Amino acid sequence: ECRRAEVLRGIAGKIPCIHFCSKETYFNALDDVISGLRRDGIDDIVILSLSTETDSIVSGAVKNGVYGEIRFMSCRKFKGLEADAVILVDFTERTVTDDAMLFYVGASRARIRLEIMTVMDNESCRNALERTEGACAGRRPMRDLASMLKCTALVHY
């Protein structure tokens, strides 16, 4: 335990968080995440889509590559760049089962904070976990998925 504390002492960020939303609560939750990051003094924020920019759940609210005042682009376009906070959107069952490398590219762009937004429910979390080698879906699939990703979980329904 002491050794773990020594290793973690130099890390400024928080444990990543996955936000489980419905389509109806998605934008309010996204706005809350952005407000929380700003409240914590983080202004270098980017929203990265695990899909394409045009297929993203937030595409209709994006104008000229910006959501509100926040930069928005695909993970592929942001490869090699960094931001203090990254909000990954369009996290789906496919991300877990087929796009792990793309997820890594997006997640590893965050210097301090990583927030993940998804509309996955218990059933889609269970399906993803069952298709992932070594993963097990218990009675609480959303929590189990968050645990597999080493994230905390927040539900916005």
Which residues fall in each region the model found?
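The feature marks helicase ATPase cores and/or their adjacent C-terminal helical subdomains
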Residues: 1-157
